[in-house]
Design a protein with these regions (language model features):
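Conserved glycine(s) of the Walker
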Residues: 94-100
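AAA+/P-loop NTPase substrate/partner-engagement loops
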Residues: 107-154
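Walker B catalytic acidic pair
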Residues: 157-159
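A short, basic N-terminal segment
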Residues: 1-82, 229-233
Length: 233
């Protein structure tokens, strides 16, 4: 990537397992993450800002995505979170949720991290369904080099915006099926479906309500993290 010199590129390309308990290693990766975020903001002429609203969240996520046990010691608003469980990042519009997850997607890809994920949006997911009539690309990916499927970790940004109909078909039911499938994938493989949303936990319960409470019950596996602050747009 153009924002790293040759020596730094060698440093990240030699391994995909890093010991972030070493503060020097942590600082290197924190700077790399910021560089990834800045590369995403370059066309807007902006710089990524680390401040009191996101600093602790970024530290947790850097530990988390590198499987560092220190992740479970980080307190965010008095709460700790678990390794291995998917992330649900919520907050107001413009707080920077999608940018953070997009930056991590780029960072994890570049460092060849086994926790790398595809970052997409709810609108992209629904458009895929409207074109193809299914969501297999975001589920098991049957036929992708294996008759048993080849699922991958993903992050769906802006979940909760799917309350619409398409030729009379309820998109909420389609998303519910997706969430069921992603829960099964997580229990079987450990591959996560991370989420960002503008909705509060209370609003999420209303959006994903079903008579048996199955969706909400499965969403209890999530590390729910609230990103506060004014709009950064």
């Amino acid at each position: 990537m153009e924002f790293l010199n040759h020596r730094d590129q060698q440093r990240t390309n030699t391994t995909n397992h890093f010991d972030l308990t070493d503060e020097a290693v942590y600082n290197f990766h924190a700077n790399l993450l910021i560089a990834c975020a800045n590369s995403l903001l370059k066309h807007q002429g902006k710089q990524f800002v680390v401040d009191d609203t996101n600093k602790q969240i970024l530290r947790f996520l850097l530990y988390y995505f590198n499987d560092c046990p220190l992740a479970e010691e980080i307190e965010i608003k008095g709460k700790t979170h678990k390794l291995g469980r998917p992330i649900l990042l919520n907050g107001y519009v413009g707080a920077g949720k999608t940018l953070i997850m997009d930056a991590f997607a780029l960072y994890l890809k570049y460092t060849k991290n086994q926790n790398a994920f595809l970052s997409t949006s709810m609108s992209e997911v629904l458009n895929y369904y409207k074109i193809n009539g299914h969501l297999d690309e975001y589920m098991y990916r049957v036929g992708k080099n294996s008759i048993d499927g080849n699922p991958r970790a993903i992050c769906i940004n802006d979940i909760g915006l799917q309350q619409q109909k398409y030729f009379g078909e309820d998109m909420q039911m389609i998303v519910n099926d997706l969430m069921f499938a992603r829960y099964e994938i997580w229990t079987q493989t450990g591959l996560c479906c991370h989420l960002t949303t503008n909705l509060s936990p209370k609003d999420m319960k209303q959006v994903f309500y079903d008579s048996n409470g199955r969706i909400i019950d499965r969403m209890k596996i999530y590390n729910v993290i609230n990103l506060t602050g004014e709009s950064r747009r």
